[in-house]
Curated annotation (Swiss-Prot):
The gene is Grp. The modification Methionine amide is found at M52. Residues 56-146 form a propeptide. Stimulates the release of gastrin and other gastrointestinal hormones. Contributes to the perception of prurient stimuli and to the transmission of itch signals in the spinal cord that promote scratching behavior. Contributes primarily to nonhistaminergic itch sensation. In one study, shown to act in the amygdala as part of an inhibitory network which inhibits memory specifically related to learned fear. The lineage of its organism: Eukaryota, Metazoa, Chordata, Craniata, Vertebrata. One of its GO terms (biological process) is positive regulation of respiratory gaseous exchange. Residues 94-121 are annotated as: Disordered. This is Gastrin-releasing peptide. Residues 1-23 form the signal peptide. Belongs to the bombesin/neuromedin-B/ranatensin family. It comes from Mus musculus.
């Protein structure tokens, strides 16, 4: 046991005699800067990537006010387009609902009867001739059957 205590005591004395100071040597170079400044010429290494692309807030406040007004106007335009699209969808939906409903016809008892002798229903001459020929065929079949 005595040997292990002696080795611990010697280790403590050696450690106490070691120079105390920063982990990296702080020596000034020829330009007056420290060695760390030469290692990281752009400043503290943790903030270099973090602050890239950042701008000062007090550079030009008038530009930010102009941007804010432009953004408000752009937002108003988007709102107008959204309202117009919503109105269009409502109209399309209403038109779609109407197209799915059957057409409204008056009851059969109120509809006028068709007179085969009356040619007012046929404005086209060819259609009238076709109907006349069909009527003749039907009359012939009716005459032979009786």
């Amino acid at each position: 046991m005595r040997g292990s205590e002696l080795s611990l005591l010697l280790l403590a004395l050696v450690l106490c005699q070691a120079p105390r100071g920063p982990a990296a040597p702080v020596s000034t170079g020829a330009g007056g800067g420290t060695v760390l400044a030469k290692m990281y010429p752009r400043g503290s290494h943790w903030a270099v990537g973090h602050l890239m692309g950042k701008k000062s807030t007090d550079e030009s406040p008038s530009l930010y006010a102009a941007d804010r007004d432009g953004l408000k106007e752009q937002l108003r335009g988007y709102v107008r387009w959204e309202e117009a699209a919503r109105d269009l969808l409502d109209l399309l939906e209403a038109a779609g609902n109407q197209s799915h409903q059957p057409p409204q016809h008056p009851p059969l008892s109120l509809q006028p009867t068709w007179d085969p002798e009356d040619g007012s229903y046929f404005n086209d001459v060819q259609t009238a001739k076709l109907v006349d020929s069909l009527l003749q065929v039907l009359k012939e079949k009716g005459g032979t059957a009786s």
